[in-house]
């Protein structure tokens, strides 16, 4: 228990230092971190769910190579979310924000049967959340932002104020050599009143999202 707590604390300190650095250097690093790990072909590639936010004001395409088949990676994606398998990122930082996250290092059978319409939370009730828009096991998962109050998927078109429309997509591209490219993409549209907020959130999302990809790789390769 003590060892686990120290590990979480150490990772959180590293994550916090990275957050500070990326926030300060965001204007210079923005193009790099929004394409972290992805090839030009992957950035340009059309993915399921792209049509849900047709004119994104912000977004990214990131990718990582995992040395195992898609079947070994999918279970970790299927159980993603608060109150499920976690978000595989800096747990200590997430919980400082009140997200009540507990990341698992096990495959949880009770969360493997993911269905369209399922709710995926990033924190407790009232925090950002998503609905499963489409799911193709061992291949593709598309989430669409839901209203934190009603937990219903939002409209495709942004409203004037206090509104964000977003998709979050995971795509597994299995290669002939037995490795798999895990591609993650987010497309975001928002009202003008939220522009500054999202510009501040963007570099934070990179640090947390990068850690998520690295952790999923570690977990999947460990079980391969």
What spans do the regions from the language model cover?
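Beta-strand/loop substructures that line and gate deep hydrophobic ligand-binding cavities in soluble
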Residues: 43, 150-210, 214-218
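Short strand-connecting beta-turns/loops that link adjacent beta-strands
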Residues: 69, 137-138, 175-178
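A mature extracytoplasmic/lumenal domain signature
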Residues: 136, 145-147, 186-188
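Intrinsic-disorder/low-complexity, polar/charged segments enriched in Ser/Thr/Lys/Arg/Asp/Glu/Gln
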Residues: 59-65, 140, 165-167, 179-181
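Hydrophobic/aromatic beta-strand elements that line small-molecule binding cavities or substrate pockets
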Residues: 62-64, 130-132, 166-174
């Amino acid at each position: 228990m003590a060892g686990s707590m120290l590990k979480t604390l150490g990772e959180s300190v590293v994550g916090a230092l990275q957050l500070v650095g990326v926030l300060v250097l965001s204007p210079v690093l923005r193009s790099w971190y929004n394409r972290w790990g992805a090839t030009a072909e992957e950035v340009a590639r059309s993915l399921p769910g792209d049509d849900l936010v047709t004119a994104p004001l912000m977004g990214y395409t990131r990718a990582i190579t995992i040395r195992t088949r898609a079947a070994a990676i999918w279970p970790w994606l299927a159980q993603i979310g608060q109150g499920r398998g976690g978000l595989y990122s800096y747990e200590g930082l997430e919980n400082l924000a009140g997200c009540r996250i507990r990341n698992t290092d096990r495959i949880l059978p009770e969360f493997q049967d993911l269905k369209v319409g399922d709710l995926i939370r990033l924190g407790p009730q009232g925090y950002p959340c998503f609905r499963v828009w489409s799911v193709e096991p061992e291949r593709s998962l598309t989430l669409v932002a839901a209203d934190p109050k009603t937990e219903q998927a939002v409209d495709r078109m942004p409203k004037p104020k206090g509104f964000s429309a977003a998709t979050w997509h995971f795509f597994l591209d299995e290669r002939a050599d037995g490795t798999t490219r895990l591609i993650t993409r987010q497309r975001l549209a928002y009202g003008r009143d939220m522009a500054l907020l999202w510009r501040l959130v963007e570099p934070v999302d990179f640090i947390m999202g990068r850690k998520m990809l690295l952790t999923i790789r570690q977990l999947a390769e460990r079980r391969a």
